[in-house]
Regions:
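N-terminal signal-anchor module of multipass membrane proteins
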Residues: 1-43, 307, 311-315
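Long, contiguous internal "core" modules enriched in hydrophobic/ aromatic residues
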Residues: 22-27, 41-44, 107-286
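Peri-membrane helix termini and adjoining interfacial loops of integral membrane proteins
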Residues: 1-3, 76-83, 241-249
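Aromatic-anchored segments of alpha-helical transmembrane domains
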Residues: 160, 298-305
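Extramembrane terminal tails and long inter-domain/linker segments of multi-pass membrane proteins
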Residues: 1-12, 47, 86-88, 119-142, ...
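Membrane helical hairpin/interfacial module
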Residues: 27-107
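Interfacial loop-to-transmembrane junctions
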Residues: 279-301
Length: 318
């Protein structure tokens, strides 16, 4: 299989824009999850001045919006997407996802608005002084903010897992029809969120890339990476022990060829082994270059994993 044919083959239905969409959704869910955990375990570090919270403020909703725009314009008839926003089907994974996105965005906006309440009120008084309902809504949220935050955490976890459910629902592809995918996508999304957050912290505090906030994310990142490795192993073991279709799918993905090299060199080599090796140097480094190297490799590995799962998963049809 040549590089050209690896991205264009007869059984391919979902191509590269979907991989980027899945990647962006994972970043949003990962950032929100880490931000809430930071506020729970280190309340003093989870205020509006937190780099993690500020990054979440921009990329939490931003990645979702950009990802959905990619998805909409990738549709054959993008102008019909609005129908999915109002016509729900509890038997459709896509429709359930739209419902989840809508609820996620509403709760996310309210949660972030309360955290950045002073900034929101200052902007409202400057640009929309007559829109007093903003302050009233923020005041109403106050007694329920912790419950809202708990709901936000649940929705972030569901969204991170949903990207895996979306692919695992494709029953005609043995590689993708795997119950491990939701958990794998959830933890790899948290890993990508951690990488983005650490890059933001390193760029903002170049003289001290190992702040309390950064150390918390590092502590969360390490077990997440090992869980990701375990889930990858479980994913392939499940294929190896499966029926004829799953064994054919495994052989097509890892039995040599373009996508096999993509996985071993890109996902495993660049995305897992190199960050683990570089982390030893980064932990001793007093500059931000070590953090950028580790997180850049890890983030690239997560993106390559999305491409591998999507394309290699469509090589074999049941």
């Amino acid at each position: 299989m040549t590089p050209a044919s690896a991205f264009h083959f007869a059984s391919l239905v979902w191509d590269w824009p979907i991989a980027i969409y899945l990647f962006l959704i994972g970043i949003s869910a990962g950032l929100v999850t880490l931000a809430i955990l930071l506020r729970r375990f280190h309340p003093e570090a989870g205020g509006s001045d937190s780099t993690l919270l500020r990054t979440t403020l921009v990329l939490g909703p931003g990645a979702i919006i950009f990802g959905l725009l990619i998805l909409v314009f990738h549709l054959t008839r993008p102008w019909t997407f609005w129908k999915l926003m109002f016509h729900y089907s509890f038997t459709s994974v896509m429709s359930m996802g739209v419902m989840l996105f809508q609820l996620y965005m509403v709760v996310l906006v309210l949660w972030l608005a309360k955290i950045f309440e002073k900034e929101v009120i200052a902007l409202q008084q400057r640009w929309l002084p007559r829109l007093e309902i903003v302050q009233k809504v923020l005041a109403l949220i106050t007694p329920f903010h912790r419950a809202l935050e708990t709901l936000m955490l649940v929705l972030a976890v569901l969204l991170g897992a949903y990207t895996g459910f979306l692919l695992s629902a494709l029953k005609s592809y043995p590689f993708l029809n795997n119950p491990i995918l939701p958990a794998l996508f959830l933890f790899s999304g948290i890993s990508s969120g951690a990488a983005v957050a650490l890059i933001a912290m390193a760029l903002r505090h170049r003289s001290n890339p190992h702040s309390t906030e950064a150390r918390f994310v590092h502590r969360m990142e390490t077990p997440v990476v090992w869980l990701e490795i375990f889930l990858l192993a479980a994913f392939f073991i499940g294929l190896a022990l499966g029926d004829d279709g799953k064994m054919r799918a495994l052989a097509a993905a890892l039995g040599g060829g373009f996508w096999s090299w993509w996985f071993w060199l890109g996902v495993v080599g660049l995305g897992l082994i190199i960050p683990l090796l570089l982390k030893l140097w980064a932990n001793r480094s007093v500059t931000f270059h070590g953090v950028l190297a580790v997180c850049g490799a890890s983030l690239t590995g997560v993106l390559l994993l999305r491409f591998f799962i999507l394309y290699a998963g469509q090589l074999t049809v049941a």
